[in-house]
């Protein structure tokens, strides 16, 4: 039986196990909660709310561990989660939860999307990016394509050449739909605490506004491997990358907000195989874009390469199916 003592605004509570809590400035509402509490956690939350948060976090981790151990795709080892068919790099818990949800609902499309996304993200040498990107993309409602790339947006300026654009900040980049835009990773600021710094900037549809740093809006595909900084505390959903692929011009609504690029366009059918094949097969001398497999523990080059080629192959197969369906309609 708990013992409760109140002296003015000071309340002292002794729980059944002998643990004693005391706190000043207790309100009448809080005191009534203490007196009428059905469980000790309700009392502890008033005196030490951080303890309840820790307990809830522990419970959440235990529940996640239980789900992972029942999974046919993920593994729980040494308090970390792994997707062994992809790599031996630990999977962020937010992504793991999404994979488990898709597995529970037998959603093969999402499972393939998540596998492809994680395959590409494993190529990112920055641990912060690997840990935070999935959370960031979901937080700011980016669309993740089946191939694992994600759709992002930016504004650009026109040039004197039709169909060729440039960045508003420096007017030095050649930007054209269907051509990779790249910046050496070493020239980018990888500090995720810096929201606006060196690198190629891409944004969520909820952040970008008409005429903000450019008069023309573009939808772009970005490889998770190329992201260099994910501002964890960003309030507007902008990140930095070292490469992106412009895929189309976009429109804005009457409020100057992005009209999101439609998902059912088949855009990945033509562009993604090119990016992946050229990225893998390119050499230092002749490739504008390369997919580097980082030399980090947990990455097996052959396994990652096989998964990359499978992504490209599946996209090509789907392209052929779409073409056949279109021809049959005609």
Predicted regions, residues:
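ADP-ribosyltransferase catalytic core
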Residues: 79, 85-87, 183-254
């Amino acid at each position: 039986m708990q013992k409760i003592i109140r002296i003015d605004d000071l309340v002292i509570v002794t729980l059944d196990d002998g643990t004693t809590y005391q706190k000043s400035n207790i309100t009448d509402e809080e005191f009534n909660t203490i007196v009428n509490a059905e469980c000790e956690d309700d009392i502890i939350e008033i005196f030490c709310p951080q303890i309840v948060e820790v307990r809830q976090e522990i419970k959440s981790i235990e529940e996640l561990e239980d789900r992972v151990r029942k999974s046919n795709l993920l593994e729980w080892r040494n308090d970390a989660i792994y997707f062994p068919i992809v790599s031996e790099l630990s999977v962020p818990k937010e992504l793991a939860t999404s994979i488990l949800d898709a597995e529970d609902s037998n959603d093969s499309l999402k499972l393939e999307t998540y596998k492809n996304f994680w395959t590409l993200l494993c190529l990112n040498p920055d641990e912060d990016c690997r840990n935070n990107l999935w959370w960031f993309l979901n937080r700011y409602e980016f669309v993740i394509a089946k191939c694992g790339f994600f759709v992002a947006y930016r504004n650009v300026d026109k040039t004197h050449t039709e169909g060729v654009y440039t960045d508003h900040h420096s007017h030095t980049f050649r930007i054209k739909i269907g051509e990779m835009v790249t910046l050496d990773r070493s020239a980018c600021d990888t500090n995720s605490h810096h929201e606006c710094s060196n690198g190629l900037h891409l944004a969520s549809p909820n952040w970008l506004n008409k005429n903000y740093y450019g008069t023309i809006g573009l939808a772009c595909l970005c490889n998770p491997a190329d992201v260099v900084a994910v501002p964890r505390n960003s309030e507007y959903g902008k990140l930095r990358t070292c490469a992106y692929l412009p895929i189309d011009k976009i429109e804005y609504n009457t409020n100057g907000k992005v009209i999101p690029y439609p998902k059912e366009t088949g855009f990945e059918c033509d562009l993604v195989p090119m990016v992946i094949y050229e990225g893998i097969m390119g050499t230092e001398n002749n490739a504008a874009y390369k997919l580097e497999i980082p030399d980090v523990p947990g990455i097996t080059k052959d396994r990652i390469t096989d998964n990359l080629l499978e992504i490209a192959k599946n996209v090509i197969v789907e392209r052929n199916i779409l073409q056949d369906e279109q021809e049959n309609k005609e």
